[in-house]
């Protein structure tokens, strides 16, 4: 495994991380096999945004005795109040779900406390100009989270996040197709975008990446294969699938 520094944190993460959404609803044996295979092959960073207690508890159980070998991105504002993935900016609700995350994972700290799904100007205001940010900063002061991060799919909003000076880590959607899309594209439209919309690297995204480097803000990548479309002969927006 090749390792790289996560911005100004001084932490080193493997170039391949583990996204855990696919483990939701799977039996414990599958979760354990996946987590252990990741650890055994040098993966030391995982993203856990899912709010359900079952998958959180299964991951916590699988990490038992090896928690110190895996850095965790745990998301603040990710909830399942209606039995499906959802977003809440209610501080009390967010606190309850984050405390449940700690309990389910059998840990007293999360490496990266991520403000969840900050895409629009309204999202930014609700997360960064509210008690939500104060809660995250309090967690960091108490050592419950080691660093503050945020996830976004929008380069304009992501730039505001980085310029706030608050975050050490940005989780952002990056792949050869998304990097060519207009900066105000919605996630669903990006995933299904036709190839004729892609005419070169979007300068807004390029500037975001430069800004992160200048500010020492690390980037972890999501949607690297565009939900699998970029490696699919039938669904790729390019003339042939990536290999």
Model-predicted segments: where are they?
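Generic structural signal for well-ordered alpha-helices
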Residues: 3, 35, 56-60, 95-102, ...
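Short, acidic/polar
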Residues: 26-38, 89-106, 152-160, 241-242
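Beta/alpha (TIM)-barrel catalytic core signal, keyed to glycine-rich beta->alpha loops juxtaposed to Asp/Glu
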Residues: 118-243
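Conserved, mostly hydrophobic/aromatic
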Residues: 6, 18, 46, 59, ...
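Active-site groove signature of glycoside hydrolases
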Residues: 100-124
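N-terminal binding-site loop/beta-alpha segment at the start of enzyme catalytic domains
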Residues: 1-74, 135, 141
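Active-site mouth loops of central-metabolism enzymes
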Residues: 16-29, 79-95, 121-125, 232-239
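A structural motif
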Residues: 40-43, 107-110, 145, 167
